[in-house]
Amino acid sequence: MKIKKIDWDNLGFNAHETKSMFRANYTPESNWQVEGLIPYGDVSLSPASTVLNYGQGIFEGTKAYQTSRERVVCFRLEDNANRFVSSSERMCIPPLPKGLFEKAVLEVVKDNLEFLPNKKQGSLYVRPIAFGEGPMLGVKASDYFTFLIYVTPVGSYFKSGLKSLNTIVSDKYHRTATKSVGFAKAIGNYAGTLLPFKEITEQGYDEIIFLNSSNENIIDEARSANIFVLKDNILKTPSLQGSILPGITRDSVIKVASHFFNLEVYEGDVTIEELMNGDEVFFTGTAAVIAPAGSINYKNKTIEFHTKYNDSMTKQIREKIIDIQHENIEDPFGWIIPLK
């Protein structure tokens, strides 16, 4: 396969063809069998596969970085692996053997180092996925599964660089429900946000905030990010009560805010009133790390945040996490996994 030329100075957050991907296959007779590295390319599926018909699939997202110590590292891989197990169990996908997730990620990153951007250009995004590939006409779990990891070089999540987001709270849609699959990185959770996001972008907004389906006085999260509200040096974020994704960047923010900045961190219900009266509001996720809210609209009322980003706690927390990821400072948490 001839790989298309990459514009390294204008990567954006897009999928690019790379050299190889990792594959393992599951059957009831042999459990998980490692196929290993294979050329990057299309995957063949039965039209009756459970992933196509019933959405039996999960994914993860992490990054590899070229650091100031002139080495390549991954960030919090064990946490991604643990969440992959949790998502697998919820979606009736046999969990991978212990250690395979981390080993496979490091192997595919190492084989695609030519696609790792330099420190100024970006990072290598890593996307592990698992899905039911066996044919099943009835609504049942597949007997056959595929585990794949592909990688792609990425730049800034935002085309014009980091910016404050104009956001809107949805009272029309819910992202998921308590006791459902909101805590899992199930593919259907994200498909359900496509229409709401399309509608709000047509209105000129950048991001959507979903309310809790059981209590619309409290917030859940954005379409692919957790939410934090800072007020009077107290940092609040919705608790992990079933409908919230246990974001790895979310957990990183909690630990960094407490360890480096002595902020009091509260995990619990966050009301609409608290959201609209915060000093700072920001979103967290692997893709953007942290993105600040510039404004929030709820029921045709818009509030704007007047704290300049360069003067904000949001910026300080974001830069501290990035410093750890790029080994500009010591990692006090044991999050960095070097490529050997």
Spans of features found by a protein language model:
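Charged, gly/pro-rich active-site loop segments
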Residues: 99, 108-121
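Helix-start/capping segments and mature chain N-termini
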Residues: 1-108, 129, 136-340
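Extended, Lys/Arg-enriched charged tracts that mediate electrostatic binding to polyanionic substrates
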Residues: 117-131
